[in-house]
Amino acid sequence: NGYHQLEMVMQQILLHDDVAVKWTEALDEGQDRKGEAPVTIRVSTNKPWLPRDERNLAYKAAAIMTEHYGKGLCGEIRIDIKKRIPVAAGLAGGSSNGAAVLHALNVLWNLGLDVRQLCALGSSLGSDIPFSIMGQAKANLELGLSKDRLAAHCALATGTGTELEPLSCGLKSYLLLTKPPIGVSTAEVYGG
């Protein structure tokens, strides 16, 4: 399946994308044949070459939230991504965008999901998403999850990367981040 067993420390850094999510409710417009109103998903980004459809993890995150919690909803999810994290650099840029969408819809739809529940949803989309959920829960006080026992800036990741144990100490170090002009996908790195 392309996944490998690992043991590593994951640490948040200050580099981030800006992800804005807006929910606009529609009133009984565009119902399908079963009388159920659909939820549409639209993604925009400052990078014209980034996918805006189901190939994008932010889109996939909105789709999984709609599948699990969107029954009876009618409206549009608009996701605007301003990329700063280099793509194909091993920095979980797409994963963090997906995590941000899960958090946003949790708040916008008043679902009250905790970090564990969000991580369970996120792990079905990718191995880096649960850690991104944990880090965003700790860093973004507006989410109301910073006191959750799984909210953390640093974690020990085992298994395929989705088994996470928060580390309260974090890594205290300086970091120089460089990105060469090439990119390698996670699937290529772990594909062997």
Question: What kind of region is each of these model predictions?
Answer:
Residues N1-A89, V107-G112, L143, G170, ...:
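ATP-binding N-lobe of GHMP and related small-molecule kinases
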Residues G2-V9, L111-G192:
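ATP-dependent small-molecule kinase catalytic core of the GHMP/sugar-kinase superfamily
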Residues E7, Y59, A63, A99-L102, ...:
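Predominant activation on well-ordered alpha-helical scaffold segments within soluble catalytic domains
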Residues A58, A89-R116, S127, F131-G135:
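DPxDG-like acidic metal-binding loop motif
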Residues R84-A88, A104, A120, H153-A155:
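N-terminal hydrophobic or amphipathic segments with adjacent small-residue motifs
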